Amino acid sequence: MAQYKGAASEAGRAMHLMKKREKQREQMEQMKQRIAEENIMKSNIDKKFSAHYDAVEAELKSSTVGLVTLNDMKAKQEALVKEREKQLAKKEQSKELQLKLEKLREKERKKEAKRKISSLSFTLEEEEEGVEEEEEMAMYEEELEREEITTKKKKLGKNPDVDTSFLPDRDREEEENRLREELRQEWEAKQEKIKSEEIEITFSYWDGSGHRRTVKMKKGNTMQQFLQKALEILRKDFSELRSAGVEQLMYIKEDLIIPHHHSFYDFIVTKARGKSGPLFNFDVHDDVRLLSDATVEKDESHAGKVVLRSWYEKNKHIFPASRWEPYDPEKKWDKYTIR
């Protein structure tokens, strides 16, 4: 008796179609997953590119001040892009080195674990391999450290065309301080040399009439030291000075009463002026009052007067003592008045 096989045939066909659809569904899922992964990769690339572009754009804005030409702008942009690409490449290289180093460390950890577990001895070949791996690891560590130092030294954002002299710089400040100290020491040595130079002082002991004497002093000596030496010279000729002390004497130069604490150096360096002549010259010329050209300043001066204070108090209302006044360094005498 013949059997009807149509139902079995249809069932087999249906099974085949179901398997085919299942396979297509799996392929579709794989395709969707691949597309999603590609989109993620593309998004990461876009983000990197965007960050890269934003960093370059920000640096370009900060380094460009004022009006610049289009060519200059393009040149700066290209330079910044190249510099940024170098930094990114170094960063990637550093990451690769870090990964290699981690792999080597992991491998070393596994080997160490095997050594602890296994009681078998290692062959010479394995020991040599371990030494080579340690050397390779040390090489990677050294290279990674060098990369980090280079990256720190060469940071993006420093434009060599920008003037940074106003910014604090420790090395520059130390160099400036060193030069300043050298100049100060050189100046002080020069001033000490000037102070040690000898000058001849012409002075006149004044008791109503003049009695000229000369004495050699150093430019660094004070008026008190000068008066002490002048007193030693004058005592043998003037009896009223034999019992006098330095504090009882006054020194009058160009109609100004000079305080005892001032030195000749003070007047020489500042080229100080008095009422009737310069205070920085202490020799005397016979033609001090004969000026051939009134427009040319003469450096000729009068002999300074050494006076007893008691004589001045008695005669300060009489010429020439009536013209004398205390020296004031703030007061300027631009024109001399000789009478």
Curated annotation (Swiss-Prot):
There is a cross-link at K100 (Glycyl lysine isopeptide (Lys-Gly) (interchain with G-Cter in SUMO2)). The modification N-acetylalanine is found at A2. The keyword Nucleus applies. This is Protein FAM50A. Residues 168-177 have a biased composition (Basic and acidic residues). Keywords: Acetylation, Isopeptide bond, mRNA processing, mRNA splicing, Nucleus, Ubl conjugation. The keyword Ubl conjugation applies. Interacts with EFTUD2, a component of the spliceosome U5 complex. Interacts with DDX41, a component of the spliceosome C complex. Residues 1-31, 150-177 are annotated as: Disordered. It comes from Mus musculus (Mouse). It is found in: Nucleus. Belongs to the FAM50 family. InterPro entries: FAM50A/XAP5_C, XAP5. Probably involved in the regulation of pre-mRNA splicing. One of its GO terms (cellular component) is nucleoplasm. One of its GO terms (biological process) is mRNA processing. Its main location: nucleus. Widely expressed in embryonic and adult tissues. A motif (Nuclear localization signal) lies at residues 152-155.
